[in-house]
Every structure is written in C-alpha cells, then in structure tokens.
C-alpha cells in the first residue's frame, strides 16, 4: 500500500442506531383547508359550496385510508367560531376534527403529531412550510398537499385496476 492511499482513506462513518419502525397502525393527519385550496378540483368545488368540498375530501380520504390501511385524521380550522368547542366525529374509517375557538388546524396537528409520532409512524399532509418543519421535529413525515394529491390519484388508479374498471 502506498502512503498516498493511507492518507486519503475516508474515515469510517459513525454508527448511528436507526429508530425502530413503530408497531401498530400508521397515522395520517391532514390539514383539511390546506388541501382543499391546494387541489384544483376541490378549490373549484369550494368556491360554490365549501361543505361539498369538505365532504368530497372526506370521501377521498376514506378510500385512500381503506386501501393504504392507515388511520386518517382530517383537521379543519374552526378557530374563528365564537364559543366553539373542539368537535370530533367519525365518518366511516375517518376521524374528522373541527378545532375549538382560538385553535388552528396547525396547532392541533402539532400537538397530535407530538404524541402520535412517539409510538406510531405518522405522516402529515400540509403545504405550510413552518408546519412541515415543526412536525418533522416531532418525528413525523411530511407530505405537501400537491404530492399527496399525486399519491391519492395513483391509489385511485390502483383501485380501479383492481376492480377491473
């Protein structure tokens, strides 16, 4: 071995133990209005009827979650509603959260992610840059609304192919 080879040998990489993959269900937290106003078809629907856009997103997430086998939590801001209490309803396999007065969807998602990501693989769908950084700090994976739309369309295509449509 020549001296030059020994001087230019890369140092061994430090071994950092990988975080174990959590057992149990995967969680998917979705910032509802962020997605509605990022997806063209939902935004157009919301221009005429916001409730219809919310229901359409709920149906989309039910199908997606059933196929991907994850626990979806869809969060809508209600922070401008005076005296509003947090409301959680179940719509098929989907949990829908309407935040309480003075609570944004981001605030709810940050708290939920902080708890869920300790024990479960957790993904957050939001195009809010600050939100993405915070949830990544809690150990969650982040997905932009646009990237999630592409993922949903791919799942819908797989479902149609499976059903032979």
Residue spans of the language-model regions?
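Nuclease catalytic cores that cleave nucleic-acid phosphodiester bonds
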Residues: 4-7, 16-30, 34-165
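Catalytic core of IPPT-family isopentenyl/dimethylallyl transferases
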Residues: 12-14
């Amino acid at each position: 071995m020549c001296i030059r080879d020994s001087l230019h040998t890369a140092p061994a990489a430090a071994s950092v133990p990988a975080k174990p993959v959590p057992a149990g269900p995967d969680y998917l937290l979705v910032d509802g209005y962020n997605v509605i106003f990022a997806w063209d078809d939902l935004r157009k629907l919301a221009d005429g009827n916001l409730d219809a856009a919310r229901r359409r997103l709920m149906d989309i997430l039910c199908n997606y979650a059933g196929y991907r086998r994850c626990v979806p939590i869809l969060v809508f801001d209600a922070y401008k509603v005076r005296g509003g209490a947090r409301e959680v309803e179940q719509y098929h396999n989907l949990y829908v959260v309407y935040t309480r007065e003075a609570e944004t969807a981001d605030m709810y998602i940050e708290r939920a992610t902080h708890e869920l990501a300790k024990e479960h693989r957790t993904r957050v769908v939001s195009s809010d840059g600050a939100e993405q950084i915070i949830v990544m700090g809690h150990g969650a994976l982040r997905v932009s609304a646009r990237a999630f739309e592409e993922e949903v369309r791919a799942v819908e295509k797989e479902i149609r192919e499976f059903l032979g449509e």
